[in-house]
Amino acid sequence: MFLLYEYDIFWAFLIISSLIPILAFFISGVLAPISKGPEKLSSYESGIEPMGNAWLQFRIRYYMFALVFVVFDVETVFLYPWAMSFDVLGVSVFIEALIFVLILIVGLVYAWRKGALEWS
């Protein structure tokens, strides 16, 4: 039988973890100063007077390179616990991890062929 009271701790955790950021944003909005002068709206560069426009546009290749890095960084985060418990998990989990790695390799080959990894 499906018992809902077994999930009371989950719902309490979900509600509390949702209320904390909402409450933090609300409190910072209430306590923040309202008037913002031109000095507050200028960019801050370590106490030095800013030279030129602070807003500059980056090329898309930097974002693509960062995206590929994040994908493989997340892959490492997922594969490390799997490697530590490889002997306990069995063959089915090995096959799932192999499929996961193969999908990432296909993505890497796609990014490589599209030129996302070329720096020049």
Curated annotation (Swiss-Prot):
This protein's GO CC annotations: chloroplast thylakoid membrane; NADH dehydrogenase complex
GO BP terms, alphabetized: photosynthesis, light reaction
GO molecular function, one term: NADH dehydrogenase (ubiquinone) activity
Top-level division of the source organism's lineage: Eukaryota
Organism per entry: Panax ginseng
Membrane topology label: Multi-pass membrane protein
Principal EC category: translocase
Family in the record: Belongs to the complex I subunit 3 family.
Keyword field contains NAD: yes
Broad class of the protein's primary localization: plastid
Protein name, as recorded: NAD(P)H-quinone oxidoreductase subunit 3, chloroplastic
Compartmental location: Plastid, Chloroplast thylakoid membrane
EC number: 7.1.1.-
Membrane-spanning parts: 9-29, 64-84, 88-108
Catalysed reactions, semicolon-separated: a plastoquinone + NADH + (n+1) H(+)(in) = a plastoquinol + NAD(+) + n H(+)(out); a plastoquinone + NADPH + (n+1) H(+)(in) = a plastoquinol + NADP(+) + n H(+)(out)
InterPro entries in the record: NAD(P)H_OxRDtase_bac/plastid (IPR023043), NADH_UbQ/plastoQ_OxRdtase_su3 (IPR000440), NDAH_ubi_oxred_su3_sf (IPR038430)
Signal sequence bounds: none
Keywords noted in UniProt: Chloroplast, Membrane, NAD, NADP, Plastid, Plastoquinone, Quinone, Thylakoid, Translocase, Transmembrane, Transmembrane helix, Transport
Quaternary structure, from the entry: NDH is composed of at least 16 different subunits, 5 of which are encoded in the nucleus.
Function: NDH shuttles electrons from NAD(P)H:plastoquinone, via FMN and iron-sulfur (Fe-S) centers, to quinones in the photosynthetic chain and possibly in a chloroplast respiratory chain. The immediate electron acceptor for the enzyme in this species is believed to be plastoquinone. Couples the redox reaction to proton translocation, and thus conserves the redox energy in a proton gradient.
